[in-house]
């Protein structure tokens, strides 16, 4: 991609009200389906339905160009289908099962050519949806995919991810991580396209005909990652003005999520044809367990070990555990001290003061590590004083 821009030089007093670019190229008249998966978030998804209906589906300019498909994995939603809105009750098979059901239903609508996967809180501008649809209508390659960058909801000018990069078929890292979108230089950085491996389902738009495989309808964290892995032919791009605001993932660290996260990493590694992928997975596993253990997150470490064993149990495990009923019971049985749910805290409007112990000194850190957090020395040598650690300090060296 290159830059198209306007230079304006005024010879006298004048006002520039706006400008636009036009093309004589043929543009398809097909529609786009907005697919949302929700689970027991009635208030959020109802607000999203009403907002999209008011600003998009009932507007004369757009009403024939968009359809809304809401896949409900939880309790009934008080909203009827009709007028471009389809509400579908679905078995709770996670985000993957919900979005794949929405994709199947979108294929049944004759004039729908493109689909956007979106979060149920619809935390994006309507302009992002319109801009994405216009871009895909002009795309020459059916494998062109648009992913919206993710901005932090508590710091909305900072980018968490603008697409993600694959590393050795199973590790991945976010592109443009912590880029401040307010700077002029940031625009150049943002437009510096790289080979993106997958895009998050908080905003992921594509041509229906480019989808070769459905994702497995089972619970994983990062089901969008597996979907991207199965569609490596996709040419994933990002666009200025196409973004979504989301909660910081580090606030979602929990025992269950850590179990699911490791499964997400393990599956691509186990099916990869790359040499030593399984060995690298084992090294990654040992590293993550040690990091969690030295961070005093022992229940989280146990969940990772459980996940590792389950992933090596064969296909029967996946077939017998499509839902999370039995796995939740096992996770709950080992979770006693790490149940704190920071997702429910209003971090934008509320704050809590805690005594700060300061950053751990290097000598203390050294002794803590060589004594395995003090477990190798008698308990009476230890000062039993609780300390407060920032929720982001998953890594023990950040204490």
Per-region residue spans from a language model:
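Terminal low-complexity segments of carbohydrate-biosynthetic enzymes
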Residues: 1-3, 8, 263-399
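Acidic donor-binding segment of Leloir-type glycosyltransferases
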Residues: 51-88
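Short beta-strand-to-loop acidic/aromatic patch adjacent to the donor-nucleotide binding site
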Residues: 111-123
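Conserved donor NDP-sugar-binding/catalytic core segment of glycosyltransferases
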Residues: 127-173
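Donor nucleotide-sugar recognition loop
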Residues: 198-203, 212-229, 234-239, 256
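Active-site donor/metal-binding and catalytic loop motifs
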Residues: 17-24, 235-255
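N-proximal low-complexity "stem/linker" segments adjacent to membrane-targeting elements
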Residues: 1-50
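A recurrent flexible, glycine/aromatic-enriched loop bordering the glycosyltransferase active site
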Residues: 177-203, 252
């Amino acid at each position: 991609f290159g830059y198209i821009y306007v230079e304006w030089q005024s010879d006298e007093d004048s006002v520039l009200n706006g400008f636009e670019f036009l093309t004589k190229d043929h543009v398809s008249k097909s529609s786009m389906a907005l697919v949302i998966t929700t689970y027991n978030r009635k208030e959020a998804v109802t607000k999203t339905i009403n907002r999209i209906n008011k600003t998009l589906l009932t507007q004369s300019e757009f009403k024939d160009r968009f359809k809304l498909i809401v896949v409900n994995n939880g309790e009934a939603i008080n909203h009827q289908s009709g007028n471009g809105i389809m509400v579908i009750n679905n078995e709770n098979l996670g985000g993957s099962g919900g979005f794949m059901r929405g994709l199947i239903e979108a294929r049944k609508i004759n004039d729908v050519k493109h689909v956007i996967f979106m979060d149920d809180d619809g935390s994006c501008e309507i302009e992002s949806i319109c801009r994405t649809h216009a871009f895909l209508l002009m795309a020459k390659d059916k494998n062109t995919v648009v992913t919206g960058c993710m901005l932090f909801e508590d710091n909305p000018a900072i980018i968490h991810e603008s697409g993600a990069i694959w590393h050795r078929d199973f590790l991945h890292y976010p592109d443009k991580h912590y880029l401040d979108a307010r700077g002029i230089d940031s625009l150049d950085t943002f437009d510096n396209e790289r080979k993106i491996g997958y895009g998050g389902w908080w905003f992921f738009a594509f041509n229906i005909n480019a989808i070769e495989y459905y994702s497995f309808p089972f619970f994983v964290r990062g089901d969008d990652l597996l979907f991207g892995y199965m569609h490596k032919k996709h040419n994933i791009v990002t666009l200025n003005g196409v973004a979504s605001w989301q909660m910081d993932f580090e606030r979602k660290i929990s025992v269950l999520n850590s179990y699911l996260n490791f499964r997400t990493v393990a599956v691509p590694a186990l099916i990869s044809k790359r040499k030593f992928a399984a060995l690298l997975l084992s090294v990654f596993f040992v590293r993550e367990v040690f990091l969690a253990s030295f961070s005093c997150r022992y229940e989280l470490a146990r969940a990772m070990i459980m996940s590792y064993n389950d992933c090596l149990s064969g296909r029967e495990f996946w077939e017998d555990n499509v839902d999370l009923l039995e796995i939740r019971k096992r996770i709950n049985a080992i979770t006693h001290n790490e149940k704190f749910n920071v997702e429910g805290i209003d971090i934008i409007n509320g704050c809590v003061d805690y005594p700060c112990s300061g950053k751990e000194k290097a000598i203390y850190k050294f002794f803590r590590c060589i004594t395995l957090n003090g477990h190798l020395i008698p308990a009476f040598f230890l000062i039993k004083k609780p300390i407060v650690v920032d929720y982001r300090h998953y890594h023990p060296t950040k204490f």
